[in-house]
């Protein structure tokens, strides 16, 4: 560069003025380059985190609930479902999805037909989950693990932790029966733990595969559950969404109203099952710990991120569902500040509904490879 500058000074004297102008003009690109260098530096800093966003359309290919429900098969597995079956405007078998009794019976039939679950029940007013969507989360998490190896992950060796297992125990049921995982389920609600334990005890397919732990502190998520010698391949969680009981009640009522409006639009009759009038019983319902916490979903997953750092060497992949899209970016920024090495955001769309989960690991690719080799 010095030689080029020296040669430029040897130009004829009559070009002295233009030379001065050119020198001024040359200064501008230098400032632009400086800005570009700053941007490049920032970009390089961001690239320290291996971030991938993945969009998935439709239910996972391994999900047993692709397409319409096979009511003949379901009724054969759970005959009590027959009394809840109705015809939709197209003349196809269906149920009244605003009737919690019908939804609960459908779940029993689905679990019996596709998951070899002989007994499943939940206490009144506890969350009754839509199984196809819940199952898809587990299938996508299994896909995340498969992405760590050539071929298939050794799923029979997987240890998983479900935060907020609930009375329904749905994620451990899917993980155990579909992949052979060993699951630990935690919950702050003792009644949920008792219900989940009852499900495990009364199903041969789950015996010895699911351990249930009560979280004794409402302010903790992983602390008190993950012991010093524990090593989990993955964690799962469906966090409480609402900020208060009132907010949760309004949200459930809004969902019910939307469902009824949609059914009326399609011409579905609603007087098929004997549901008490007055205060609605919602299949969208649930107990306090299932539906709300102070600060809502954003505050819960923020605590989850902070606490996960203390267990960075004991968990390969942390994951959580995130209902509100606006919570994704702040969560990502927080995880980057905490020093995670890899982040995945997996969007799952089923029709008009879009759900997502975020996964993060404090281990880089080589460390994750070593983890897997040592299993």
From Swiss-Prot:
Top-level taxon of origin: Bacteria
Broad EC category: transferase
Recorded catalytic activity of this chain's protein: adenosine(1618) in 23S rRNA + S-adenosyl-L-methionine = N(6)-methyladenosine(1618) in 23S rRNA + S-adenosyl-L-homocysteine + H(+)
Transmembrane portions of the chain: none
Biased composition (Basic residues): 27-38
One function term, GO molecular function aspect: 23S rRNA (adenine(1618)-N(6))-methyltransferase activity
InterPro entries: METTL16/RlmF, rRNA_lsu_MeTfrase_F, SAM-dependent_MTases_sf
Keywords: Cytoplasm, Methyltransferase, rRNA processing, S-adenosyl-L-methionine, Transferase
UniProt subcellular location: Cytoplasm
Cellular component per GO, a single term: cytoplasm
Any one GO biological process: rRNA base methylation
Region annotation Disordered: where it falls in the sequence: 1-39, 262-281
Enzyme Commission numbers on file: 2.1.1.181
One Pfam family it belongs to: Methyltransf_10
HAMAP family in alphabetical order: 23SrRNA_methyltr_F
Summary of the function given for this chain in its UniProt record: Specifically methylates the adenine in position 1618 of 23S rRNA.
Family: Belongs to the methyltransferase superfamily. METTL16/RlmF family.
Name of protein: Ribosomal RNA large subunit methyltransferase F
Organism: Vibrio parahaemolyticus serotype O3:K6 (strain RIMD 2210633)
